[in-house]
């Protein structure tokens, strides 16, 4: 019988209420081009990373995305988000309690994020590195989410089979990545709705989540 061998956590919007910080920086960046960030463009950016994120942004703003423009925007965004990540970042409801619950049960955990390592470290300052046996960032694998690379690498580092791990995500992009890696999936939407699909279990928040819920997800996933 399949057992729960690991929990793999997304960071932005799942553990930390940090999407608002990204939103602030993106709106400021759009303003520098004399544009206004629309809700549709913002939603399309949630979970995106690297050059693809800036192509989505520039297309949405109606701006030509030359290589030079993308590089300049990326440098500005990293500097601004670094400023905003200084100091404690708010937690998502129930996230800290669930981390404590899983750790107390002795189940290994990994942080699996599309955020660059340099920025993820600021998030880890708030969360606490002691929770995780591994942390994997998008700039440390060939392809970020929605590719499965970050999840496959996290499972490898923990020495677990992806199908015996539960991924906890908040976005469509992250959900696709987790399922492509073969993980059981719990979706707790934050800033943008996540479409229902086979293999996706939804909760409104992490408040009240029990270890048995995660164990059941693995069993159901193994039998699907």
Describe each model-derived feature in a short phrase.
Residues 58-97, 105:
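Metal-dependent phosphoesterase signature
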Residues 1-43:
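Active-site neighborhood of HAD-like aspartate-dependent phosphohydrolases
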Residues 35-37, 63, 129, 159-160:
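Helix N-cap/coil-helix junction residues
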């Amino acid at each position: 019988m399949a057992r729960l061998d690991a929990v793999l956590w997304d960071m932005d919007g799942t553990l930390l209420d940090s999407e608002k910080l990204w939103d602030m920086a993106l709106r400021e960046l759009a303003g520098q081009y004399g544009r206004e960030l629309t809700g549709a463009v913002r939603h399309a950016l949630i979970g995106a990373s690297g050059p693809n994120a800036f192509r989505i942004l520039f297309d949405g703003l109606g701006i030509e995305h030359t290589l030079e423009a993308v590089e300049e925007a990326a440098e500005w965004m990293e500097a601004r988000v670094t400023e905003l990540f200084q100091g404690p970042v708010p937690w998502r409801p129930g996230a800290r309690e669930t981390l404590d619950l899983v750790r107390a049960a002795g189940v290994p955990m990994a942080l699996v994020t599309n955020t660059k390592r340099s920025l993820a470290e600021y998030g880890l300052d708030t969360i606490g590195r002691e929770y995780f046996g591994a942390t994997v960032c998008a700039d440390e694998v060939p392809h970020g989410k929605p590719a499965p690379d970050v999840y496959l690498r996290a499972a490898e580092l923990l020495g677990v089979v992806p199908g015996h791990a539960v991924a906890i995500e908040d976005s469509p992009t992250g959900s696709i990545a987790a399922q492509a890696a073969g993980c059981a999936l719990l979706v707790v939407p934050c800033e943008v709705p996540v479409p229902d699909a086979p293999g996706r279990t939804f909760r409104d928040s992490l408040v009240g989540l029990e270890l048995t819920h995660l164990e059941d997800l693995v069993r159901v996933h193994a039998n699907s």
